[in-house]
């Protein structure tokens, strides 16, 4: 009985679809075809314009360069080059980067330049306990990122913004979170040297990590890694949500 009812429903559905297809040419007068085509083309153009507007608007909000360019700095410390970013904590603004970017260089010789060519005046330096992170105090209110306090999700879209290859230009690298730990996350965004200190942003434009290091995991002796992402280059970003900061002398 149930089988017959299902069969009748399928036949009824096919009949109605056929009837609609048969009636559509009759329902639309021939004289209206040209007007309909013109209207359709105009609508297509408007939809294209609207799509471009939405793309531009959302790129400012989804962790992209447009909404972040006034918060990024190119860092040069001796022979080292990397990335820094401004983030607000409470009422204070700090410039964050990796400790290895400025290692062995006096704070007075660290140069952090915003993309509008403003050189930041760096104040007191603090180092993260047990992590490759430092931050410098900044004076005055400045455009700044906010920290994402929630634990990120695997599969979440992220953007890495920074001084890729240390060539003095900021690039935008997109990818996803593919691993989450208490102190770091793993991403598939292909950042490289020079991106050390780059903010890793979620779609809301908040900081979920600091691009910090790559690990070459190629191991031909371990057959279990063959044809997996664990037998290649892996990329990690340090989380900031539970860092303990210590003053530097």
Region roles according to the model:
Residues 18-27:
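Bacterial N-terminal signal peptides
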Residues 35-37, 43, 47, 81, ...:
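Catalytic-histidine neighborhood of serine endopeptidases
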Residues 93-97, 132-138, 185-187:
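A generic structural motif
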Residues 1-12:
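N-terminal secretory signal peptides that target proteins for export/translocation
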Residues 142-195, 211-224:
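Flexible, gly/ser-rich surface segments that form the specificity/activation loops bordering the active-site cleft
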């Amino acid at each position: 009985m149930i089988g017959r009812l299902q069969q009748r429903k399928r036949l009824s559905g096919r009949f109605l679809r056929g009837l609609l297809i048969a009636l559509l040419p009759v329902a639309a007068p021939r004289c209206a075809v040209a007007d309909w085509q013109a209207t359709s083309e105009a609508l297509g153009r408007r939809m294209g314009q609207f799509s471009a507007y939405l793309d531009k608007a959302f790129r400012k909000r989804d962790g992209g360069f447009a909404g972040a360019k006034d918060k990024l700095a190119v860092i040069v410390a001796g022979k080292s080059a990397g990335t820094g970013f401004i983030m607000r904590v409470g009422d204070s603004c700090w410039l964050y980067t990796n400790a290895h970017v400025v290692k062995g260089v006096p704070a007075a010789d660290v140069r952090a330049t915003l993309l509008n060519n403003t050189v930041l005046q760096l104040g007191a330096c603090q180092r993260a306990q047990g992590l490759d992170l430092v931050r410098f105090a900044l004076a005055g209110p400045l455009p700044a990122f906010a920290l994402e306090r929630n634990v990120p999700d695997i599969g979440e879209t992220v953007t890495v913004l920074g001084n890729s290859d240390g060539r003095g230009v900021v690039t935008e690298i997109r990818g996803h979170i593919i691993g989450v730990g208490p102190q770091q996350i793993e991403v598939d965004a292909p950042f490289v040297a020079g991106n050390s200190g780059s903010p890793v942003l979620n779609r809301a434009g908040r900081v979920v990590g600091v691009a910090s290091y790559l690990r070459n995991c190629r191991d031909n002796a371990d057959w279990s890694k063959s044809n997996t992402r664990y037998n290649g280059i892996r990329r990690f970003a340090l989380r900031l949500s539970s860092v303990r900061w210590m003053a530097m002398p």
